[in-house]
């Protein structure tokens, strides 16, 4: 709802983690009390999206990793928990899976 990042998920996750643009503005971030943890940001881009799309209650739900769920996911080169927020957008996608099949 505001122009702080592109539509790329990793860009949005970085903003959620820092409340700053990719240039580090503003210092301290917008509303720093709204900074999300990595787990909260990943949930916002996965399980929360599925819930908004009413796909979390289907016979084969998506948006989370659990038995019976649709395996749509990306495998990143590094764990987002292990990098600084400003490094998240540069994480390379090692593989993409749709319905459990590698598609890259």
Can you describe what each PLM-predicted range is?
Residues 85-104:
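P-loop/Walker A phosphate-binding loop and immediately adjacent motor/lid segment at beta-alpha junctions
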Residues 1-81, 96-99:
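His/Asp/Glu-enriched, well-ordered alpha-helical/loop segment
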